[in-house]
Swiss-Prot record:
It comes from the Eukaryota. Disulfide bonds join C57-C63, C85-C95. It comes from Bos taurus (Bovine). Coiled coil: none annotated. The lineage of its organism: Eukaryota, Metazoa, Chordata, Craniata, Vertebrata. Granulocyte/macrophage colony-stimulating factors are cytokines that act in hematopoiesis by controlling the production, differentiation, and function of 2 related white cell populations of the blood, the granulocytes and the monocytes-macrophages. This CSF induces granulocytes. This is Granulocyte colony-stimulating factor.
Amino acid sequence: MKLMVLQLLLWHSALWTVHEATPLGPARSLPQSFLLKCLEQVRKIQADGAELQERLCAAHKLCHPEELMLLRHSLGIPQAPLSSCSSQSLQLTSCLNQLHGGLFLYQGLLQALAGISPELAPTLDTLQLDVTDFATNIWLQMEDLGAAPAVQPTQGAMPTFTSAFQRRAGGVLVASQLHRFLELAYRGLRYLAEP
């Protein structure tokens, strides 16, 4: 049944162009090896992000992202949408575009956190590399499917953290947002991976 629904969604997506990309045709689907690798990458990035949050909590007592929400708005930390990847409204081409765009956004946010603290730098570097690897994996799959936009996205304005506290609070907020983003991505990818 899910295969029929997915094929119907793919057929429907062939009628519309999304983000200047060629939609996937009804006979195309994502390779199982790609989906499994993506699920593995999501789990790895979530573990990296959780480690960053735990270390910020232990070292700087920044343990509750919800307490920092007002600061998120004043710092201008954007959130990435992933509405096209929900199982109810799954649009494969749009989902891949949103997933790549979100990962690209989080690459920039993690780069903006550079200098957070010497003891957290290795954790942040690992997280950054894993997000970059996942974004590259998504982009290459989009190219293989002929669904990649003609031009790769460019990084928009990123927040400027002017103090050590802002950088650390930003680290908690970015890691928390990335975790929520990846939870949605994981659900969508797991739905696609089911036979």
